[in-house]
Amino acid sequence: MEELQGYLEKDRSRQQHFLYPLLFQEYIYTLAYDHGLNGSIFYEPMEILSYDNKSSSVLVKHLITRMYQQNYLIYSINDSSQNRFVGHNNYFYSHFYSQMVSEGFAVIAEIPFSMRLVPSFEEKEIPKSQNLRSIHSIFPFLEDKLSHLNYVLDILIPYPIHLEILVQILQCRIQDVPSLHLLRLFLHEYHNWRSFITSNKSIYVFSKENKRLFRLLYNSYVSEYEFLFIYIRKQSYNLRPTSSRAFLERIHFYVKIEHFIIVCHNYFQKTLRFFKDSFMHYIRYQGKAILASRGTYLLIKKWKCYLVNFWQYYLYFWSKPYRIHINQLSNYSFYFMGYISSVLINPSAVKNQMLENLFLVDTVTKKFDTIVPVIPLIGSLSKAKFCTVAGHPISKPVWADLSDSDIIERFGRICRNLSHYHSGSSKKQSLYRIKYILRLSCARTLARKHKSTVRNLLQRLDSGLLEEFFTEEEQVICLILPKTTLFTLHGSHGERIWYLDIIRIDDLANSLDWS
């Protein structure tokens, strides 16, 4: 606890006190809406609203001018339900401006975290490589580790029971009272916050609006709860993690710390010896985490009970036991990062001969396996209006007004992205089915536009349409083997490939509804 208190005292000197005036600076909104910006340390650049760069500067100037007016922010947010600005009935909508402010606030709120993380990265001399950000790099790690483990905890991250908890977590970094009040306004006035906090689906399904702000809050919140896991690991193994980062809330912390001291003295030393496991691995992506162990079922069950009780009673996080599932790797599979993963057991017999004696030795090998969840993926395609619920391709009427090249390019890009991300699947047949759905949906969309039949359209555009749906690795194979057809390509290309340039899950794979 002395080490923890020393960390808190040292960290207070880095708190930011004057962030609110930055909301009146035009360059802040340029950073928030720069689609090519790679400076964000938490997430990728994204499209917020569809407007061109020429009009965006005009919008920002109008916004800053009105923000200088007294109580404008309060009026604009409260007036968002009426969809108009104060004094402007037919001009820009209040909802649009308040969304711009929230995105600018998110950029400002990132500053304290970036000031803390960037120096630590420089001290550790982490090379500036895009490959370090690839989420596909997690799967080779799982291949290497999970085949030697027995159980896995499949965890859905608990969510806070009150919005004020999110504000308090940010108070560890932001002491600017006006900024915190503005954050409370956004959380309580927007209609979509409830789906973000109390959704029955996985918590990483964020609201479509104010993504940057909500993701900042979510990352801060998850860092708070993960500190508990890091602390337990330190106490049980007496090892100092070198790659962990923890953000702790300071407000009301000393109320919690009294309970923490009691637990440490009266409970930790007696129970942590039951949690010693040198083969324990924890991996999280967005709202899903897995905790894998080589220990027994009793040990992993203790971890589950311990985490649930500690989250609920000492950190005031609402976590229900059914959000944590215990799976034996040899008998069950688990869903993580768009794949259904499992550990396959392959028994085999080895013939050995020593002198004149011949005998058989039964051996068992374990292999980490990943496959594409085809049924949920078809469900995502159905929601996006590419096919029916049964998986029958249909046309996309909303794209029928585009040019032929734009339609083919859009379908081809979706197909290539899905193929690129799911290239690590050990069973390619389900992936080929998805590509078939997208290709035929593209053909039916073009046929709908030209009022023709799919057969006639495919005869006219088959070669060009097929090339658009080739992935990079398939194009390389076709260059090496010019006589390779599509069907022989499907049969020969069955190896799993993990790419080091994938920094996010495809939107269709990310929207899978798994309970």
Swiss-Prot record:
From the UniProt record, which GO molecular function terms apply? Answer: RNA binding
Instruction: Name the domain of life this protein comes from.
Output: Eukaryota
**Chief location:** plastid
Q: Where in the cell is it found?
A: Plastid, Chloroplast
Q: Which GO terms describe its biological process?
A: mRNA processing; RNA splicing; tRNA processing
Q: Which GO terms describe its cellular component?
A: chloroplast
Keywords, alphabetical: Chloroplast, mRNA processing, Plastid, RNA-binding, tRNA processing
Checking InterPro entries in the record gives: Domain_X, Maturase_MatK, Maturase_MatK_N
Any Pfam family the entry gives: Intron_maturas2
> Which family does the UniProt entry place this protein in?
Belongs to the intron maturase 2 family. MatK subfamily.
Q: What does this protein do?
A: Usually encoded in the trnK tRNA gene intron. Probably assists in splicing its own and other chloroplast group II introns.
Q: What is this protein called?
A: Maturase K
| Native organism | Helonias bullata (Swamp pink)
